[in-house]
């Protein structure tokens, strides 16, 4: 690593520590030429799979789209931002863990419903009604009955 002070190539690592939830490494370095110390952070570059929509169109995974969909269902519900972030992280971890380059959008929708069901039943019904295109009140009732089982 080049020294940010004198641009020398020779630096040594003095200290390394895990930060975050073990997802990154903080390294304290010292330049062997000018003796200045500096800190670097290393994070693994994790690639999300592409999303295959129902019409076979492929698009990059969009975390913001996922977040907005969940937040819309959770609007005015008593769920903390931390709980939402944990649910989003669970979904992303699962998708990365598949090892697939592409995943169907249906899988993502089902993962969202699974997480919403754990977070808030009303938000789950809201999301399911749009995701599954409920046509009438009967379909709402059937889904609510399944939740109560």
From Swiss-Prot:
Q: What does this protein do?
A: Negatively regulates transcription of bacterial ribonucleotide reductase nrd genes and operons by binding to NrdR-boxes.
Checking Pfam families in the record gives: ATP-cone, Zn_ribbon_NrdR
Q: List the lineage, top down.
A: Bacteria, Pseudomonadati, Pseudomonadota, Gammaproteobacteria, Enterobacterales
Q: Cross-referenced NCBIfam families, in alphabetical order? A: transcriptional regulator NrdR (TIGR00244)
Q: Which PROSITE patterns match?
A: ATP_CONE
The Swiss-Prot or TrEMBL record lists the needed cofactor(s) as: Zn(2+)
Where are the zinc-finger regions (unnamed) in this chain? Answer: 3-34
A GO molecular function annotation here is:
ATP binding
Give GO BP annotations, semicolon-separated.
Answer: negative regulation of DNA-templated transcription
Q: Where does this protein come from, organism-wise?
A: Enterobacter sp. (strain 638)
Q: How is the cofactor bound?
A: Binds 1 zinc ion.
| Keywords carried by this UniProt record | ATP-binding, DNA-binding, Metal-binding, Nucleotide-binding, Repressor, Transcription, Transcription regulation, Zinc, Zinc-finger
Provide the family line: Belongs to the NrdR family.
Q: Which InterPro entries match?
A: ATP-cone_dom, NrdR-like_N, RNR_NrdR-like
Q: Where's the ATP-cone domain?
A: 49-139
- Official protein name in the record: Transcriptional repressor NrdR
């Amino acid at each position: 690593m080049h020294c940010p002070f004198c641009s020398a190539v020779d630096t040594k690592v003095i200290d390394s520590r895990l930060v975050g939830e073990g997802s990154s490494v903080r390294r304290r370095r010292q330049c062997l030429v000018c003796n200045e110390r500096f800190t670097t952070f290393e994070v693994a570059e994790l690639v999300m799979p592409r999303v295959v929509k129902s019409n076979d169109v492929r698009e990059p995974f969009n975390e913001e789209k996922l977040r907005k969909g969940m937040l819309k269902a959770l609007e005015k519900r008593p769920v903390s931002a931390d709980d939402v972030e944990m649910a989003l992280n669970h979904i992303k971890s699962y998708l990365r863990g598949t090892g697939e380059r592409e995943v169907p959008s249906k899988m993502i929708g089902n993962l969202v419903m699974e997480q919403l069901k754990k977070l808030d039943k009303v938000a789950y019904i809201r999301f399911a009604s749009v995701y599954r295109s409920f046509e009438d009140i009967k379909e709402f009732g059937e889904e609510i009955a399944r939740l109560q089982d």
